[in-house]
């Protein structure tokens, strides 16, 4: 055998033993295609404003194509259901909101597993949830609502931005402790619920969407469902202060399907962290009465796991579990 033929034969033999994956073209650097962020609520609420702030920052500062799409309904579970089934390449992401991940799965069947089907990328904001009424309402405080409900069973109508969400469950737990009967009216988003309230169709709304309406003097806060008071409204009590069994705020962030590539996670962690220092984002937080709260992917995942179990236990203890 000639030397040239021998070398050629060895090269072919070695090549035959190399896995085909080594010859595959390298994956393009993230992001290689446009990104869509799915919002679990209708347009116009606090979640919408925060999502558009994230998308605008990424477009303007990172020069990438980012779209925002809305998937309201079904207890805010449509968006996470679609994200869970999406290709894990970072082109489909979602706005994280507490309810569809931490409460709804304990109360109804959903097509995803909160602890297994997602990559929690970064949290960026919290907004105290509140029960609020029109500014001209007869109810000046939370005690007024309880007295009215006690004397008029079922006549106090209230709604939230999503059925069986954390706001819904927290208020139901408080009302149960007070032994009063009210009428819950479901809506697909905070903006829709507020429109119904201002139109006189319901008496109150519980959501994180009150900021612009509060600033305009259209609504009055009666009680916060969390642990922290609002500095500008020190007389508004919290559920924690009143000793109610569930006290929680709304946390928002970015998530994607399970098994997202590390570079996609790092990319959006960076975008989120940078955005939180921008004047534009601070203005949005002021509009929605929110505050900054950065959680990296690892810390965000731990937060979800801890609160999923805690809220599940609380829901079961309250006898609210229907699944």
Q: Which positions does each model-derived feature cover?
A:
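N-terminal twin-arginine translocation
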Residues: 1-5, 10, 14-30
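Short, cationic motifs built from Arg/Lys/His that form the positively charged side of catalytic pockets
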Residues: 3-4, 52, 70-71, 122, ...
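N-terminal (or domain-start) structured segment
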Residues: 27-117, 155, 163, 167, ...
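An extracytoplasmic/periplasmic, membrane-proximal ligand-sensing/linker region
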Residues: 32-34, 176-182, 262-323
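Hinge/capping helix and adjacent helix->loop/strand transition within the periplasmic-binding protein
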Residues: 85-91, 106-188, 192, 239, ...
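A ligand-binding cleft/hinge motif common to bilobed small-molecule-binding domains
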Residues: 99-109, 175-177, 204-234, 312
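Short beta-strand->loop
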Residues: 113-123, 181-185, 211-212, 216-247, ...
């Amino acid at each position: 055998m000639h030397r040239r033929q021998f070398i050629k034969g060895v090269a072919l033999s070695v090549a035959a033993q190399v896995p085909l994956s080594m010859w595959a073209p390298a994956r393009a650097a993230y992001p290689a295609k446009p990104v869509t962020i799915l919002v679990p609520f209708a347009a116009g609420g606090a979640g919408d404003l925060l999502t558009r702030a994230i998308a605008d920052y990424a477009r303007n500062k990172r020069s990438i194509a980012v779209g925002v799409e809305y998937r309201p309904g079904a207890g805010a579970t449509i968006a996470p259901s679609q994200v869970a089934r999406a290709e894990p390449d970072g082109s489909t992401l979602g706005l994280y909101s507490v309810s569809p991940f931490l409460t709804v799965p304990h109360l109804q069947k959903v097509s995803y597993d909160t602890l297994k089907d997602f990559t929690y990328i970064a949290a960026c904001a919290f907004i105290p949830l509140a029960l609020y009424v029109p500014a001209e309402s007869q109810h000046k405080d939370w005690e007024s609502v309880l007295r009215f409900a006690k004397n008029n069973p079922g006549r106090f109508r209230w709604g939230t931005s999503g059925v069986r969400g954390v706001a819904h469950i927290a208020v139901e737990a408080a009302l149960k402790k007070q032994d009063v009967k009210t009428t819950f009216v479901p809506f697909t988003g905070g903006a829709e619920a507020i429109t119904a309230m201002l139109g006189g169709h319901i008496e109150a709304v519980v959501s994180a969407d009150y900021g612009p309406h509060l600033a305009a003097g259209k609504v009055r806060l009666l009680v916060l469902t969390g642990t922290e008071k609002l500095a500008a409204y020190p007389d508004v009590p919290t559920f924690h202060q009143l000793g109610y069994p569930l006290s929680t705020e709304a946390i928002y962030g970015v998530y994607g399907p399970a098994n997202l590539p590390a570079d996609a996670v790092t990319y959006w962690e960076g975008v989120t962290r940078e955005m939180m220092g921008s004047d534009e984002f601070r203005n949005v937080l002021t509009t929605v009465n929110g505050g900054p709260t950065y959680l990296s992917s690892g810390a965000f995942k731990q937060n979800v796991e801890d609160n999923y179990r805690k809220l599940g236990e609380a829901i079961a203890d309250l006898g609210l579990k229907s699944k």
